[in-house]
């Protein structure tokens, strides 16, 4: 007898997987740069390593809360349009921020990426409050 599919999450895991895949090269760039330039701990006052560290670090600091909010939205029954829009905005925002912070010179990617991430935080948080508080 085959059991019914009990997966209740079908959208958020897509974005979590994409973000997990992105995290690999973001982190590997730091490690490879450290090995190449023989910088074991800290940033060795190396501007490039500092930027790579912050690009990867900011990803670690911002993604977990965002995906928890998306997971709660999905568990509470948010529509696919909400979830795909916010998931895509999060992924796009994180890529823009990473490219902006690790690139040469000031770029628009960093502020646009943070604005996108803050947008996901705000919209998802308000959606959850409105749903729970009725």
Regions found by a protein language model. Give the residues of each.
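Interfacial loop-to-transmembrane junctions
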Residues: 96-120
């Amino acid at each position: 007898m085959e059991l019914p599919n009990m997966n209740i999450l079908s959208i958020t895991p897509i974005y979590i997987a994409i973000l997990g895949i992105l995290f690999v090269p973001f982190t590997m760039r730091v490690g490879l740069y450290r090995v190449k330039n023989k910088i074991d701990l800290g940033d060795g006052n190396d501007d490039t390593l500092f930027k790579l560290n912050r690009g990867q670090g900011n990803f670690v600091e911002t993604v977990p809360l965002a995906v928890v909010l998306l997971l709660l939205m999905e568990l509470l029954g948010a529509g696919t349009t909400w979830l795909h829009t916010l998931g895509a905005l999060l992924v796009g925002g994180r890529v823009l921020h990473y490219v902006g912070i690790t690139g040469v010179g000031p770029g628009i990617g960093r502020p646009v990426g943070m604005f996108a991430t803050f947008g996901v935080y705000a919209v998802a948080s308000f959606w959850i409050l409105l749903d729970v508080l009725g």
